[in-house]
Regions:
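Amphipathic alpha-helical interface segments used for dimerization/assembly
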Residues: 118-122
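N-terminal intrinsically disordered, cationic/polar leader segments
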Residues: 1-109, 123-142
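Helix-rich interaction surfaces within compact, conserved domain-sized segments
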Residues: 111, 115-117
Length: 142
């Protein structure tokens, strides 16, 4: 399995209330797997794996509210796989699953690419970052 493409297809960010750092959640959902046609591949096959990367902000005071602070990034990963790997992916997807031995690498590339984009959006609309930043502190002298 080799990643040959990563595409962001939709970006959405919304701030509808001032957030008081109650809970921030990050989630990745795989939404579809399908064969992709690439003429340059001779012995291998290409798969397009669609995903959603979501950052949600919950305010403890606003239970069941329609107000939401969120960042949503939808995209796809293009994989070059062997014919056997392709069959394995498509068979697993019938149960809406990704093969366990392949999922970790896919999650990591999505986190790497989308977290950077989400941090930029959070900064632009003044949401708390979903990842803590390192901070420099004064050293205490004895």
């Amino acid at each position: 399995m080799k990643i040959i493409g990563f595409n962001i297809e939709e970006i959405h960010a919304r701030k509808s209330f001032d957030f008081k750092r109650s809970a921030i959640s990050t989630d990745i959902l795989f939404t579809n797997i399908e064969k992709a046609k690439l003429d340059v591949l001779k012995d291998d096959e290409a798969l397009k794996i669609s995903f959603k990367f979501m950052v949600g902000y919950k305010d403890g005071e606003k239970k069941d509210s329609q107000d939401k602070n969120e960042v949503l990034i939808q995209g796809s990963i293009l994989l070059m796989v062997s014919k056997d790997e392709s069959k394995e992916f498509l068979k697993s997807w019938k149960n809406k699953e990704i093969p366990k031995d392949k999922a970790l690498g896919l999650y990591n590339i999505i986190l790497k690419k989308c977290s950077v984009k989400a941090l930029q959006l959070e900064d632009e609309i003044n949401l708390s970052p979903h990842i803590p930043f390192p901070q420099i502190r004064n050293q205490q002298q004895n």
